[in-house]
Amino acid sequence: MSETDRERPLLASEERAYEETEKVLIVGIDEEEDADYDDDPGNSPKFSWKKLWLFTGPGFLMSIAFLDPGNLESDLQAGAIAGYSLIWLLMWATAIGLLIQLLSARLGVATGRHLAELCREEYPTWARMVLWIMAEIALIGADIQEVIGSAIAIKILSNGLVPLWAGVVITALDCFIFLFLENYGIRKLEAVFAILIATMALAFAWMFGQTKPSGTELLVGALVPKLSSRTIKQAVGIVGCIIMPHNVFLHSALVQSREVDPKKRFRVKEALKYYSIESTGALAVSFIINVFVTTVFAKSFYGTEIADTIGLANAGQYLQDKYGGGFFPILYIWAIGVLAAGQSSTITGTYAGQFIMGGFLNLKMKKWVRALITRSCAIIPTMIVALVFDSSDSMLDELNEWLNVLQSVQIPFAVIPLLCLVSNEQIMGSFKIQPLVQTISWIVAALVIAINGYLMVDFFSGAATNLILLVPVIIFAIAYVVFVLYLISRGLTYTPWQLVASSHKEPQRDDE
């Protein structure tokens, strides 16, 4: 995509993240009238708290993926089995997640397009269809965890009167109610997420205060790296839950909810500055909430015989057995926090599904129709899971392991295209990431992929003793590695024949 192509307006037939009338107006807030700071590179708009407030929103929606029920389960298992020793890893994993999400935001702001749209434009049909299918599979896997988490919380809060499958139906329906708020403006929907995040923070902070974890051990766990063979699985789980493939697609679309002219360099720089501040603050809040959960279970169950048996489904009951009822039973406080996590992540999952499907397939349809399609794709497998696993907490935990592996498999198909695109000057123009940032980003991506690869190998190692399972696993592994290498090769420096090929594409775009 040439610089001219990047700046051309979207055609009427093309899918777009937000219509112009839906975007939050930023221009003219706390700045001189008719100011154009591109004419004076040494000058830039002054920092404005009002502008920061107007840019605040997308980062907090993005941060929900760091607080979904899958992350909560990883937190509680890390605390129960590893104690305080993996808090340092949680901190660095969150920092890695921040880097990936800032690159995603950079892509969306600088190009005016989100990741799924750019993948549709940059990859051949067969490759983008594979990427779309992988993104949808990752989204369905995440959605199962999120909806089941909400259903578990509803079951607890109803004292078991509402079965798991009914909780799934309730979660699916109220998801549409929340998304309906977007018709009244994106800020209304963002306010709902702020309330849900605040609910999580208050619930888990109350539990933190009730159980009184050791502040000294918390500080040591955050500052002193420590890893043993016994806690490797929990360490891999922490890293694996932080990078969610659908969230990479989502953030590049969310940042387009603010009116930013990509043709004006100072506007893009300003937006990136405010989005960086907002995203950092949002993930700092998510880190604190995750620490609350980890330390509560470290204080309560580390070193006990039941530590290995605790999962999302039975965690509340274990807490209740240990700390009793009281005026505010800890079981219900836990359930309220999990419900807020499940509801918020389910909404963002549906939201991400709209952008992924619309971007890859260029579907021009009303948002509620896309939401219905994406919700239907996820609700059927989730309902099956709820009916099959309703009576077994241990089976739910085993299913969660499978779903974590599923997310691990999909990570390269979001992260590699992102890094290739933000490193490409033809797409990003002057906002292409610099060589040092490229190097750091690729090292981080390789580390995350390697860690998740370890999880996959460990999980599928049992297939080595079964010939029937071994053959398809080997075939899948070969195809998987070949496609990942293909994606990486697309990000290498353009060869002369590729430049010639891209130049032939430009007249075709002019005909559009």
UniProtKB/Swiss-Prot annotation:
Inducing or repressing factors: By iron starvation.
Annotated TM spans: 52-72, 80-100, 129-149, 161-181, 189-209, 235-255, 277-297, 323-343, 371-391, 402-422, 440-460, 468-488
This protein's name: Metal transporter Nramp4
Tissue expression remark: Expressed in vascular tissues.
Membrane topology: Multi-pass membrane protein
GO cellular component, one term: vacuole
Disruption phenotype: No visible phenotype under normal growth condition, but slightly enhanced resistance of root growth in presence of Cd and increased accumulation of Mn and Zn under Fe starvation.
Gene Ontology MF term list: metal ion transmembrane transporter activity
InterPro entries: NRAMP_fam (IPR001046)
Free-text function comment from the UniProt entry: Vacuolar metal transporter involved in intracellular metal homeostasis. Can transport iron (Fe), manganese (Mn) and cadmium (Cd). Regulates metal accumulation under Fe starvation. Acts redundantly with NRAMP3 to mobilize vacuolar Fe and provide sufficient Fe during seed germination. In association with NRAMP3, required for optimal growth and photosynthesis under Mn deficiency. Exports Mn from vacuoles in leaf mesophyll cells, making Mn available for functional photosystem II in chloroplasts.
HAMAP family in UniProt: NRAMP
